[in-house]
Amino acid sequence: MLHAFSVKADQTEQIFSHDLFQSVISQHVKDGFVDYPAIKKNTDYHAYISTLETASQFKNSIDELSYWINAYNALAIKGILDGRSPETFFGKVGYFYNAEYKVNDKIINLYDLEHDIIIPLGEPRIHFALNCASASCPKLSNEVYQADKLEQQLEHATIIFINDNSRNRFDLKTKTAYLSKIFDWFEDDFVKHSGTVQNFIALYVTDEHVSNALANNEFQIKYLEYNWSLNGTPPGHVTEDEN
């Protein structure tokens, strides 16, 4: 599906390294659960945030997309470490809109980073790779997104999210699909790709009977309440080894 991206720069350009962020999340993210206190003390994390500030040249659009996904996820963590939280209405305003970061020589907030930079790249599966530090978000991966395997990573993230019963459920008897609000908020992205939200989900759901019904748009859709509680240990938490 990434074939739509076009090469934007010379193939010999050096690709931005996400190794520092890989070091951080491989240590401090377990099955989507984030150890924020540990990340706050991790020098590799703060070094990575610093490297994001300067302008980067992208080898191609796939490289660009992987860069922005990693940048978003890293900055979403920073918002929590800076004492912000999307759990309440005013918290969301502060977390997504008021908090600004320097990334790729731009000053930008998380909302604009997602809506003005990432979504226009035309890849709907990014909605299952981006994590905004909340329980109902797609689980934060403990692997950075890389251009050379981005297709496989996005496929995996999409399959995992859609088939997670805590995020999406399908009742064949009543033909009711209980879906994540992500499919409501970003409906246009899925419609542009597959015609309908149900058609998009049908491509990834593993139950053949559910997939066939979705492909025929047979389900009534109801959206599940989104859980905005933190997806990990709060940054102010004192762990046992600190007592």
Feature roles, as predicted:
Residues A4-S6:
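N-terminal signal peptide c-region/cleavage motif recognized by signal peptidases
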Residues Q11-N243:
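Interaction/scaffold regions that mediate signaling and macromolecular assembly across diverse proteins
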